[in-house]
Structure formats: C-alpha cells, structure tokens
Amino acid sequence: MLGETKDDVLKRLRFIDGHIAGVRRMVEADTYCVDVLKQTYAVRRAIEKLEGIMLAGHLRTCVVEGIREGRDEAVLAELSELYRVGR
C-alpha cells in the first residue's frame, strides 16, 4: 500500500474506531434506538469509503503490477473473489 493511501486508511480507521466507541456509549446509555441506528449507518458509510480508497489503491498498484508481470489470470481470479465476497 502506498504511503499516502496508507496514511488516509489509518486516519479513516481511527475515525471509525472513535465512531464505534461512541455507538457503544450510546447503547450503554440506553440512547433511543433510531439515534443509535443513524450512527451505525454513518459507520457503515465510513467503512464503504475506506473500502473504496483501498480498492482504488490496489487497482492502481498491485493489479497493474500483476498484469505487467504476466499474472493476468491470478489477478482476475483475485478480483473475482473480492467481488464475490463483497456482494
């Protein structure tokens, strides 16, 4: 993972950690369920954004490198598996 992408990923993970801790506190405080759910949706969106950043970085680096090295089939199999798992 490139340094800039890694820094962005780590920053977003810290944000997600903090957000989840906040959700935990809300549940412990018996906060209204709808308010807790809104925060869990925000966490999900943050994770989806994180996944997008990681995937874009992977496509720009590892996938390009794999194709240049002639590992087309392995790269495509890996991307197909990732798609299957992410569905």
Where are these regions (language model features)?
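Solvent-exposed interaction patches of small proteins and small membrane subunits
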Residues: 1-87
